[in-house]
Amino acid sequence: MTITFNFQPIDKIRKQVRSKLWLGVVIATSLTFPTLANAEITQRDIDNYATAMAAAANAKSISRVANLVADDALISVSRKGKTTTLNKSNYLNLLQNNWSKATRYGYDIQLNNVVFSGNHAKADAITTEVIVENNVTTRLVTTSRITFAESGNSVLLSRAISQLVIEKH
């Protein structure tokens, strides 16, 4: 009786192991990458958003504000029982209109009660715009629930439902 062993050369086995390891690395990387691209929004991101939005509005920089609002953003604004919905373009035009008529302009935003859900977050917001025109001070105060979405390395306003109060002094 003869027993025959079929041994593969050790180099061939090493190549097979390496190719399987390499395939495993490629698969693991491709599964991990989307998770990294859709990073979770943090409190720091929300704080940075508020700081950036206030700075952009106070600088009257439409391009900087535009970079903080998603292209498909919708902002629903209610006042005295009437509601209107603004898209990004309408919102930016409204800001520019307020800036153009103001001899003095100020913007403040406070975000709190933030709820995080992966690459989205919702927050209560109070924004105050102070517009001085012809020595008359107008305060536009909005109380909102804002939805933020992560996009690339940025956090953007995606949706907002707002109640507006206008005070003239």
Identify the function of each model-found stretch:
Residues 53, 65-66, 73, 91, ...:
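Hydrophobic pocket/interface hotspot
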Residues 139-169:
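Short beta-strand edge/turn micro-motifs at domain boundaries
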Residues 34-67:
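Short, low-complexity N-terminal intrinsically disordered segments enriched in polar/charged residues
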Residues 54-55, 69-82:
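Short, solvent-exposed secondary-structure junction/capping segments
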Residues 92-134:
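Surface-exposed, charged secondary-structure patches
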Residues 1-17:
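N-terminal secretory signal peptides that target proteins for export/translocation
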Residues 22-33:
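Bacterial N-terminal signal peptides
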Residues 72-74, 125-131, 163-164:
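Generic short beta-strand segments
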